[in-house]
Regions:
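Short, well-ordered beta-strand segments in beta-rich or mixed alpha/beta enzyme
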Residues: 1-8, 37-66
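N-proximal accessory regions
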Residues: 2, 14-19, 45, 58-63, ...
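Short amphipathic alpha-helical segments
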Residues: 13-36, 73
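Short, flexible helix/strand-to-coil boundary loops that buttress conserved ligand/catalytic motifs
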Residues: 21, 66, 75-78
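Residue-level detector of secondary-structure transition/capping positions
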Residues: 25, 69-70, 79-82
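Glycine-rich beta-strand-turn "strand-cap" elements at beta-sheet edges
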Residues: 39-48, 75-100
């Protein structure tokens, strides 16, 4: 399962958000075998515009991720930092391709 999370973060909270995101991403990848990739980038000219590439082994792994204490902590801790969130479902064009 592959999807994109597109966020706009409150500029006054950007550094706090990045710290929370770093902790959540590192914990998820370390503890959850079904979380294959969480790769976050910000736009060069709009640093508050963040896109996260999320790759999960399958839908079961994604749903399990949503129930973990570290993800719930991230969501509750950052809810007032995020001005907008768009979750984009995707269809991989080369499904067998792996990120090295």
């Amino acid at each position: 399962m592959v999807r994109l999370a597109k966020l706009v973060v409150d500029s006054t909270q950007l550094e706090n958000y990045k710290a929370a995101l770093k902790e959540e991403v590192e914990t998820s990848v370390r503890l959850e075998p079904g979380v294959l990739t969480l790769y976050a980038v910000s736009e060069k000219d709009k640093p508050t515009h963040i896109t996260i590439l999320e790759i999960y082994a399958d839908t079961v792994a994604y749903k399990a991720h949503l129930q973990t204490p570290h993800f719930i902590n991230y969501k509750t801790g950052t809810k007032n930092m995020i001005k907008s969130l768009e979750l984009v479902g995707t269809i991989p064009l080369v499904p067998g391709m792996k990120i090295k």
